[in-house]
């Protein structure tokens, strides 16, 4: 396992759910998401990473392209969590869930309309 991921798992007590609330089935499923993009001078270290499962990582990049407002709200939450150096709180996950619920509902409706 990547040393930075392991270090972050311990700092943020991230063993059951990633930072977007997705269940961690195996630690090897965790990835490092750059909160501030490298091409926008984002650091390549734990001060700029969010711990996301592969599924969440794909989702956040989908949101970046298709739901920019929600992507920015989520990235703001990720940054605040990163800077706190503490484990995600219940309030944090509730806020994340609220944003994701809106997006997932819209995605589901769009899929229905295509059928």
Placement of each model-derived feature along the sequence:
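Residues that flank catalytic or metal-binding motifs in active/ligand-binding sites
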Residues: 14, 31, 47-49, 77-79
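Short cysteine-rich loop/turn motifs with clustered Cys
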Residues: 1-31, 53-55, 60
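Short amphipathic alpha-helical segments that mediate assembly, nucleic-acid/protein binding
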Residues: 1-5, 70-74, 90-96
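Short beta-strand-alpha-helix junction that forms the catalytic/metal-binding core
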Residues: 40-59
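Short cysteine/histidine-rich metal-coordination sites, predominantly Zn2+-binding motifs
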Residues: 34-41, 67-75
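Short flanking/linker segments adjacent to small metal-binding domains or redox-active Cys/His motifs
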Residues: 78-115
């Amino acid at each position: 396992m990547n040393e930075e991921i392991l270090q972050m798992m311990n700092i943020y007590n991230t063993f059951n759910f990633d930072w977007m609330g997705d269940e961690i089935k195996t630690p090897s499923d965790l990835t490092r998401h750059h909160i501030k993009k490298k091409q926008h001078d984002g650091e390549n270290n734990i001060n700029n990473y969010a711990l996301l499962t592969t599924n969440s990582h794909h989702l956040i990049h989908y949101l970046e392209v298709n739901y920019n407002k929600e992507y920015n709200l989520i990235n703001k939450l990720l940054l605040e969590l990163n800077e706190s150096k503490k484990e995600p709180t219940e309030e944090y996950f509730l806020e994340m869930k609220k944003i994701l619920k809106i997006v997932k509902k819209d995605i589901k409706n769009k899929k229905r309309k295509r059928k």
